[in-house]
Amino acid sequence: MTYQMKKQWLLAIPVCASLLFLSACQEKPAPSADANTPAAEQKNNASSTLIQGKVERIPLQKNQFCDDQGCTQYDLQTIKTNVPWIDEYFLQRIKKAVPTAFTNENKEAKADAEKVQGINQSTIYVRFISQNNNLATFMIYSYEYSAGAAHGMYHQEFVTFDLNKQKRLALSDILKPNTEATVAQALYEANANWLEQHNITPQKLQLSDNFYYGVNGLVFVYPLYEIAAYAEGMPELKLPYVSAKDVVKAEYLPSLPQYANP
């Protein structure tokens, strides 16, 4: 190697070292906060959650509870999903509805009274109904029969969760502010024939907080005896989505087709 080449090579070493030092000292870009933060990760997981559920019977120490008023036989079944907080919600609902089914206290009923009156029945089932993106709908079916009664009483309660917010949605959560009167009027007009046959005027019709998302509209469910006879079951009144789009918040409205103007 010539003296001139050695000189050029030695001069290049400090320059390369300086470049490496400057490169190492440059400020690295901050990590993106949208995908790595716990809150964002939890929201993304909720949005992509596909509910899987099966009905399971709740194990009880005794399926029959007795006190001075008689005996009640319980059949309690809940939903087991891949979302723990949903499972816990329904378990606590059932425990609150029938606390005696979970108590250790139990009395022997008088044999004569049991033969004459029979045994009361209490049934609760929870079922997974449907899911639309981040909205998951379940149904609580309950049946109560008092021994000696002409018939039992049943009820179906629909529960819709916003998986992103991890909360149950009330009617007030999905409606735009101050639209209740408009919704009631639209609901009456959409079901006018049936309501008129049952002598229900627009002034008498109240919105039910028991609702679910149907195929073609928002369905309001009413308890036994409230707007119809027992024999007709629990009436359902449908508000078509085409009417609901102006009163339901966009985030809680299913994706609708674009209809051509006539």
Protein language model annotation of sequence segments:
Residues F21-A24:
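C-terminal motif of bacterial Sec signal peptides marking the signal peptidase cleavage site
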